[in-house]
């Protein structure tokens, strides 16, 4: 009770006469005045700071001071004692319940016990009598007992025992037997002016009576039982009380300027409350079964920056209910006296660091609200409030894991937490929160100062060197930021949101996304920060434009492109990447730009945008450009005709690669033309390659004829040795040769101009290409000449003759002649040729072609084969002649035998 608080409200403006008494029951508030008026107000909301609603005002006939208004719940009425009169009025409209009955000469009216809810019997004390009467609902008043007993100043009844005060002493009276028991005299004090006497008091406390008497300076109180025995030590007051009442544990007494609360067991002063200088107490009375809304708690629970609904207001009001111990009246105000709200007590414990016990207590209320007489909504509200306060207190103490756990369950506005980090928080950021949470938040310093304060209280920190202190500060700050990152990330993933935040859901998510992005951008681990930021941007944002502005301001162009991709701004994505590749933008997060463009272009993009950036990519990286075209062709998005339409002549490399890999049969002629033109035309830019080819051909020509391979075999090795040059040239060469062998006849004619007019000067460097051209044109002599005459490819020439032997038999003679025309170096090959193809030549022809200065020994093998062949032929002729003679003889003998057989058969028949 030491934390008792007074909750005051101004006296309603309608009361123009001094107020003398007050009563509250069943949502009805009554004021009695010095002039005999009674005011009835509705007080259903229990809002002390709001003016109650005036229901009715009555003026009593006596015009006397209203001494007391006592509730009579059994009758739904109030007993109004004014001057020496009293009547019973209905509680809701102040009409008389017993119009014909008025109590006169009344001194005291009281109930025989502490609880009056279901009782109808009351003690009436008049100037001359004591009466125990019963009020009936049917309008009848029964007098149970009556005793003539004049000059009673005050009395209280407990059961059938009445404690009363006469002019001289306290006495006990049995109202049933009329037996009296004198107790002790009262203290009389006569002032110098008008003989003023301080009236003794009797307070009923459980089964005891507290008897009070004394002087203006002090007073004493004695506790006696129903037999008159003193039950406790003497109670002393530092003033003579104006009013006194008791509860099971305390005695409350008021003077004009102060309220004293005394422990009834120890009889020691617990607390003294003094009024302001211009105020004075005039009345105090005990209250039971009454609740009121504690405005301080109501204010704490009220959410700032959001409109409340009737449901939320009602929940807040019920969560703020406090049970007062008494009602009081001063010359300027009225109100309740109540212990500090349990929420204030729990919050105080939390703010001094004792967090777990209050959380356990509120958790019990949340699990079983009916047990505590509250609704689920009230229990949730109280729990959420204390959890939010606890989360902030844990953060303040540097206990970030505990703080994180409570932040996620308490449904706090994330912007409250964000505001603790100045580098993420901007001044225009507002948040929706309990007023009490906002007030507590204002008492917490920013993250830097809070971390410093936490560590300063650490003895280990104080005893270490400055370098280690700086390290500890940085680590603790990092933990604080990690906690925030985890909290905001989880909040972003969680789709549920508190009801009171629904109206500001967009603003909340904007703040969360903005802060998360800044946290990721500030991460020391660039890869992890980029990954997290990318996931955030791709998760779906509430404020795309706001985040876009942040990324532009921070020059985070790669992440900007990620954001643009989420809204399908294809042109924006590709333009950003293009500028990063060309150096107009710089961003350390960006890499593999050309690959990224290629992968992005495979998506479903507007044709104009696709071709704009595909052609750009082809110019900067033919390989990646070709891959895009191939992928889109395979998917059916584009055709070869589309590619031919959009690629210009400067992109022949890409077009060739595309046509080859797409295996476009209908465009082989174009491909052949492109390859040949590219191959021959590129030599202007590749002098080293041209020189290498010339050297290679000359080297091949000079190789010993029997050791050299075919030129085709030699060429394969050549490309391997020339890997330092553009591999495209070798590709064009080989592709041209392959296409020359497979394209239609009319396609061959289309490249004639390229070969023999435009690039004729370079054609000699590519003998296989020239040979293939003549071969397809069936110009066998020219085709053979290219191989043998031009490059001395004797083995290649022989292989070619084997291919055309059936259609061009004279090729062997051409081969021999062209080989001999190349000089003496081919003699060994001719020797082998004559040996392998002896029957393709006549001896006379060979002798005519062989130069005179050549050694005829090279013909030895050739002549041997011819001689052997002639011998075989002669032998075959002689054998044939012998066989013919033998056959003729055999036939003759056969015919003779047949004739003899026929003659014999004829004779038998006769």
Swiss-Prot record:
Its main location: cytoplasm. Signal peptide: none annotated. PROSITE patterns: CNH (PS50219). TPR repeats lie at residues 69-101, 383-416, 554-587, 674-710, 712-743, 763-797. Residues 16-288 form the CNH domain. GO terms for cellular component: CORVET complex; cytoplasm; cytosol; membrane; nucleus. It holds the Pfam family CNH. The keyword RNA-binding does not apply. Keywords: Cytoplasm, Protein transport, Repeat, TPR repeat, Transport. It is found in: Cytoplasm. The keyword Transferase does not apply. GO terms for biological process: autophagy; endosomal vesicle fusion; intracellular protein transport; late endosome to vacuole transport. It comes from the Eukaryota. Belongs to the VPS3 family. Required for sorting and processing of soluble vacuolar proteins. This is Vacuolar protein sorting-associated protein 3. It comes from Schizosaccharomyces pombe (strain 972 / ATCC 24843) (Fission yeast).
């Amino acid at each position: 009770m030491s934390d008792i608080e007074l909750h005051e409200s101004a006296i309603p403006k309608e009361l123009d006469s001094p107020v003398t008494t007050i009563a509250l029951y069943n949502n009805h508030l009554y004021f009695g005045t010095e002039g005999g008026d009674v005011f009835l107000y509705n007080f259903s909301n229990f809002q002390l700071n709001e003016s109650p609603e005036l229901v009715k005002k009555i003026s009593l006939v006596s015009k006397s001071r209203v001494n007391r208004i006592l509730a009579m719940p059994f009758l739904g009425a109030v007993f109004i004692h004014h001057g020496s009169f009293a009547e019973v009025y209905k509680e809701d409209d102040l009409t008389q319940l017993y119009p014909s009955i008025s109590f006169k000469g009344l001194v005291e009216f009281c109930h025989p016990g502490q609880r009056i809810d279901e009782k109808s019997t009351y003690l009436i004390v008049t100037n001359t009598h004591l009466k125990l009467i019963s009020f009936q609902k049917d309008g009848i008043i029964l007098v149970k007992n009556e005793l003539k007993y004049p000059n009673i100043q005050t009395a209280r009844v407990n059961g059938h025992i009445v404690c009363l005060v006469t002019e001289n002493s306290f006495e006990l009276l049995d109202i049933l037997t009329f037996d009296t028991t004198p107790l002790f005299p009262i203290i009389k004090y006569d002032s110098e002016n008008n003989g003023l006497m301080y009236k003794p008091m009797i307070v009923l406390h459980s089964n005891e009576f507290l008897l009070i008497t004394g002087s203006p300076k002090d007073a004493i109180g004695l506790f006696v039982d129903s037999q008159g025995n003193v039950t406790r030590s003497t109670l002393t007051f530092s003033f003579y009380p104006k009013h006194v009442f008791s509860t099971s544990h305390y005695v409350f007494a008021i003077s004009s300027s102060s309220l004293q609360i005394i422990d009834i067991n120890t009889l020691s002063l617990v607390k003294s409350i003094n009024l302001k200088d211009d105020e004075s107490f005039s009345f105090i009375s005990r209250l039971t079964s009454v609740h009121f809304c504690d405005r301080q708690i109501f204010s704490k629970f009220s959410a700032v920056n959001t409109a409340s609904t009737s449901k939320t207001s009602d929940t807040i009001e019920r969560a703020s209910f406090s049970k007062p111990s008494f009602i009081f009246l001063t010359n300027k105000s009225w109100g309740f006296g109540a212990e500090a709200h349990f929420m204030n007590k729990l919050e105080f414990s939390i703010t001094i660091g004792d967090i777990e016990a209050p959380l356990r207590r509120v958790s019990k209320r949340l699990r079983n609200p009916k047990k505590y007489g509250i609704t689920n909504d009230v229990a949730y509200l109280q729990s959420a409030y204390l959890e939010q306060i606890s989360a902030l207190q844990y953060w303040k103490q540097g206990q970030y894991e505990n703080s994180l756990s409570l932040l996620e369950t308490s449904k706090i506005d994330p912007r409250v937490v964000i505001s603790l980090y100045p580098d993420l928080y901007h001044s225009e950021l507002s948040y929706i929160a309990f007023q009490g949470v906002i007030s507590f938040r204002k008492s917490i310093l920013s993250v830097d100062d809070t971390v410093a304060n936490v560590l300063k209280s650490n003895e280990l920190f104080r005893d270490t060197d400055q370098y280690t202190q700086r390290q500890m500060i940085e680590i603790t700050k990092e933990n604080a930021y990690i906690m925030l990152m985890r909290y905001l990330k989880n909040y972003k993933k969680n789709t549920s949101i508190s009801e009171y935040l629904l109206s500001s859901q967009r603003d909340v998510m904007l703040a969360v996304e903005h802060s998360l992005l800044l946290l990721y951008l500030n991460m020391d681990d660039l890869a992890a920060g980029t990954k997290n930021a990318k996931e955030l941007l791709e998760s779906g944002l509430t404020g795309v434009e706001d985040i876009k502005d942040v990324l532009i301001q921070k020059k985070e162009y790669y992440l900007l492109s990620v954001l643009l991709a989420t809204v399908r701004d294809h042109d924006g994505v590709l333009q950003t990447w293009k500028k990063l590749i060309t150096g107009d933008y710089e961003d350390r997060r960006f890499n593999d730009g050309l690959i990224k463009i290629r992968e992005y272009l495979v998506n479903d993009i507007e044709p104009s945008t696709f071709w704009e950036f595909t052609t750009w990519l082809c110019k900067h990286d033919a390989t990646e450009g070709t891959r895009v075209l191939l992928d889109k062709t395979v998917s059916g998005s584009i055709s070869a005709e589309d590619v031919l339409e959009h690629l210009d002549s400067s992109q022949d490399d890409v077009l060739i690669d595309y046509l080859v890999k797409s295996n476009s049969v209908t465009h082989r002629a174009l491909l052949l033309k492109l390859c040949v033109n590219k191959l021959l035309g590129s030599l202007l830019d590749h002098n080293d390659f041209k020189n290498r080819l010339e050297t290679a051909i000359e080297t091949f020509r000079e190789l010993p004829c029997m050791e050299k391979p075919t030129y085709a075999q030699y060429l394969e090795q050549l490309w391997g040795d020339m890997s330092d040059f553009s591999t495209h040239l070798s590709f064009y060469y080989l592709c041209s040769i392959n296409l020359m062998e497979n394209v239609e006849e009319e396609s061959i004619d289309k490249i004639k101009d390229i070969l023999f007019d435009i690039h004729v000067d370079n054609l000699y460097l590519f003998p296989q290409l020239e040979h293939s051209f003549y071969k397809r044109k069936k110009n066998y002599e020219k085709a053979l000449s290219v191989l043998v005459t031009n490059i001395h490819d004797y083995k290649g020439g022989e292989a070619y003759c084997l291919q055309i032997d059936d259609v061009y038999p004279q090729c062997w003679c051409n081969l021999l002649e062209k080989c001999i025309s190349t000089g003496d170096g081919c003699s060994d090959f001719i020797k082998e040729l004559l040996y392998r193809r002896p029957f393709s030549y006549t001896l006379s022809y060979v002798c005519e072609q062989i130069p005179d200065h050549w050694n005829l020994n090279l013909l030895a093998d050739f002549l041997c084969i011819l001689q052997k062949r002639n011998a075989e032929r002669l032998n075959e002729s002689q054998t044939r002649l012998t066989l013919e003679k033998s056959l003729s003889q055999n036939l003759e003998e056969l015919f003779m035998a047949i004739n003899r057989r026929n003659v014999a058969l004829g004779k038998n028949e006769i």
